[in-house]
A protein has these predicted regions:
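Class I S-adenosyl-L-methionine-dependent methyltransferase catalytic core
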Residues: 2-163
């Protein structure tokens, strides 16, 4: 089994059931935080040999021992090592994707979970410069009952192995 197949298999497990609705928050601007599904994080951590930093965390959902919260301002910090990024999906997402790309140029390996918004400027300016793995189906973020109303992708910036 190839590593990319493992990602696709995860996507199959998270497929949305026909007729399921979405929580109202998914269609509102009530939040731009989408908590990473633990199983997806665990699989990515295994593929990349563990992550050393989560720069877009809350104390409650941090995925790494070293993490930055909103108060720490992850955009203003240096990212080193193997970094996992699931940024807020609001208006600042272009800043996070640019930061991920720029930190990879300084030596970090940055693995991002992003909405697959291929029609956006930030996707064309930065996301497409990484290796892109589109996830099959739609993810269930955090404790949501239903799948997200958008597809997702893993974007990898930096020196890494090819799968």
């Amino acid at each position: 089994m190839g590593l990319a197949l493992g990602i696709q298999e995860f996507g199959r497990l998270e497929k949305r059931k026909a007729g399921e609705g979405h929580a109202n928050v998914h269609f509102s601007s009530a939040t731009d935080e989408w908590e990473t599904p633990q199983r997806l994080f665990d699989e990515l951590s295994w593929i990349f040999g563990g992550f050393t930093l989560d720069p877009c965390a809350t104390r409650a959902n941090a995925k790494c021992i070293r993490f930055f919260t909103k108060a720490d301002d992850g955009l203003a910090q240096r990212w080193e090592g193997k970094v996992f990024v699931n940024p807020p999906y609001g208006r600042d997402i272009p800043l996070w994707v640019r930061k991920a790309y720029e930190e990879s140029l300084k030596g970090a390996l940055v693995v991002c979970l992003l909405p697959a918004r291929t029609d956006t400027r930030w996707w064309w300016d930065y996301a497409r410069r990484g290796q892109v793995w589109f996830l099959r189906g739609r993810l269930k973020f955090g404790k949501a009952r239903n799948s997200a109303p958008f597809p997702s992708a893993i974007v990898i910036f930096g020196r890494y192995f090819s799968v």
